[in-house]
C-alpha cells in the first residue's frame, strides 16, 4: 500500500480553496508524471472555517523533491513532509484565500494536548 502524507487544511471558502489546491497539486502531479497521487476530502464546517484533508502520495512528493533538488531543501521545515507543506503554502499564496495547513500527524500528537 502506498504511503501518504495527510495534511489538515483549514479554509474560509471550501469550494474556491479546494479547487485552487487541486490545481496546485495537479500541476505538481503532472511535473512528476504522476496519476491519482492526491485526494481532497469533503469539508466539515465549524466556527466559520471549513476543515478538510489533502492526502498526497509520498512517492509523488519524493519525486518532486528529487527534481527540485536544493531548491526543495531550502524550504522551511525538518524533513520531507514539513518542507512539502512549506512548498504548498508558498504555491497557494497570492490566491486571495484564507488557508492554513498542518500535518495531520502533528495535530494528533500529544504535543498539542487537545486532540
Regions found by a protein language model. Give the residues of each.
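Short amphipathic alpha-helix segments
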Residues: 10-38
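Short, intrinsically disordered low-complexity segments
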Residues: 33-74
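Conserved short beta-strand edge segments in small beta-sheet-based binding/regulatory domains
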Residues: 71-112
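Short intrinsically disordered terminal tails
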Residues: 1, 112-115
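Short structural boundary motif marking the start of a folded domain
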Residues: 1-7
